[in-house]
Amino acid sequence: MRIRIAARGSKLSRIQVMMVENYLHKLGIETEFIEIKTKADLFQNEPLSKLGKGVFEKEVNQAVLDNKADVAVHSMKDILTEISENLEIYAVLPRDPPFDILISRKNLFNLEPNSIIGTSSIRRKNFLTFYRNDLNIKDLRGNIDTRLKKYFEGQYDGIIIAEASIYRLKEQVQYYRLDPHLFTPEANQGIIVVIGRKKDETIKKIFNEINDKDTLEIAIAERKALSIVGGGCHSPIGVYFEKYDKDFHGIISSSFGRKKITIEEYFHNMTPYEAGELLGKRFLEEIKNEGIIP
């Protein structure tokens, strides 16, 4: 049997596909890589906020819907909380480091005033501005190799990216991991997800064998919290869950100009849906109490 895997053509995306392929090859399944060019790849000078939601996923998923591929592989943080009704999550791999990192010669609080810091994430920009409003924050697009090249050329004094990308690429660079209480990661950061057609039970059954159930429960909790908050808050949210046996620990945070709201909770004997929903509702209640939303 051969499974066709659709993904973007970047080096990082290709490595993520290879990680999935390694699991399939151990099961005796052959694979074929289907490269998809997305709008995000074609317009790398445009800020992500201008390209719209789902910019990394829609065209890749469409290849699955059009039967040009059997499954799509993504970084799960790029997947909208609601995907096509004809698609579903088949599997996730064990989570890689979920944190944000600052690649720089100095840590965040030792950077000189007016240091140039690169990021294309509004969430990261908002956290940066809250802690260090004396920094010069500039957009930074392109694949990880491009971003690192710009940093080493001296165009930036530091750049903020996901630790998982450095981990997967095996890049040897000096960096500082950002505490999730201060820089709460994007929901599902560090998780590789496989998406397929709902009615394709044969392929779905294969991926059920490689699915990491604990990581999936964490992903569900984070996505549920994000979906609860999403309709009531226009500022990008960080959501991070950990699982200990049957218990969950969750952090949800966002920065609103000079004010930053963070909620941290422990949840006992709850499903991931229940834990995520409760954390999201408590965050909404807090930002209402603070007058951030009506």
Curated annotation (Swiss-Prot):
Keywords: Porphyrin biosynthesis, Transferase. Binds 1 dipyrromethane group covalently. It is an enzyme of class 2 (transferase). Its cofactor is dipyrromethane. The modification S-(dipyrrolylmethanemethyl)cysteine is found at C233. InterPro entries: HemC, Porphobilin_deaminase_cofac_BS, Porphobilin_deaminase_N, Porphobilinogen_deaminase_C, Porphobilinogen_deaminase_C_sf. HAMAP family: Porphobil_deam (MF_00260). The porphobilinogen subunits are added to the dipyrromethane group. Belongs to the HMBS family. This is Probable porphobilinogen deaminase. It comes from Sulfurisphaera tokodaii (strain DSM 16993 / JCM 10545 / NBRC 100140 / 7) (Sulfolobus tokodaii). The gene is hemC.
